[in-house]
Amino acid sequence: MIGSITGNVEEIRDSYIILNVGNIGYIIYVSHKVLQTCKVGDNIKLYIETYVNRDNITQLYGFLNRQEQDYFKMLVTINGINYKTALSILSKLSPEQIFSAVVNNDKIAFKGNGIGEKLAGRIITELQYKINKMPIEETFSIIENDDSLAALISLGYEKLKAFNVIQEIKSKTPDASTQEVIRKALQKLSQ
């Protein structure tokens, strides 16, 4: 298995790039966001997921960071989501936007590209469970640096519920100290 590949972008196509590594060109499927940030000749590092399709053809999927790769891996475990669909979701939504959509139960964020309301609901339900099980440091940067969220999680509150309450408090009182946010969150969560 391949964990990551570093090389020069040789070609950019509609859904993949050809990455030249040691004079070998690897076809790597990437999100539209990656396609837009790459230029021919760029030296980039991609984290790789390997998939062998029904015809026994190996396909490589590349991500600029582990966070995007982690969300991709979670998405493909959901019934009805294949690699192509997961990549189209990541083309449309960043991991932070996926997290926010899950927290806010926003089915509309996932709809489109063959995803209807029922599948969008399944995505939200299954990701709520999977995100709550992820270690806090793997969720994403705004969670990593949030002491108030870390405090609530250490007290046993669910990550998504605590995050939602903290975001609500911070939107109403953006200058609140960490202690104030924790106090208000505990009041709200104990109701």
From Swiss-Prot:
Region feature (Flexible linker): 143-146
UniProt-listed SUPFAM superfamilies: DNA helicase RuvA subunit, C-terminal domain, Nucleic acid-binding proteins, RuvA domain 2-like
Region (Domain I): 1-64
Pfam families: HHH_5, RuvA_C, RuvA_N
Phosphoprotein among keywords: no
InterPro entries with a match to the protein in the record: DNA_helicase_Holl-junc_RuvA_I, NA-bd_OB-fold, RuvA, RuvA_2-like, RuvA_C, RuvA_C_sf
UniProt region (Domain III), positions on chain: 146-191
Molecular function GO terms recorded: ATP binding; four-way junction DNA binding; four-way junction helicase activity
Annotated domain remarks: Has three domains with a flexible linker between the domains II and III and assumes an 'L' shape. Domain III is highly mobile and contacts RuvB.
NCBIfam families noted in UniProt: PRK14600.1 (NF011194), ruvA (TIGR00084)
Quaternary assembly: Homotetramer. Forms an RuvA(8)-RuvB(12)-Holliday junction (HJ) complex. HJ DNA is sandwiched between 2 RuvA tetramers; dsDNA enters through RuvA and exits via RuvB. An RuvB hexamer assembles on each DNA strand where it exits the tetramer. Each RuvB hexamer is contacted by two RuvA subunits (via domain III) on 2 adjacent RuvB subunits; this complex drives branch migration. In the full resolvosome a probable DNA-RuvA(4)-RuvB(12)-RuvC(2) complex forms which resolves the HJ.
Protein name: Holliday junction branch migration complex subunit RuvA
Lineage: Bacteria, Pseudomonadati, Pseudomonadota, Alphaproteobacteria, Rickettsiales
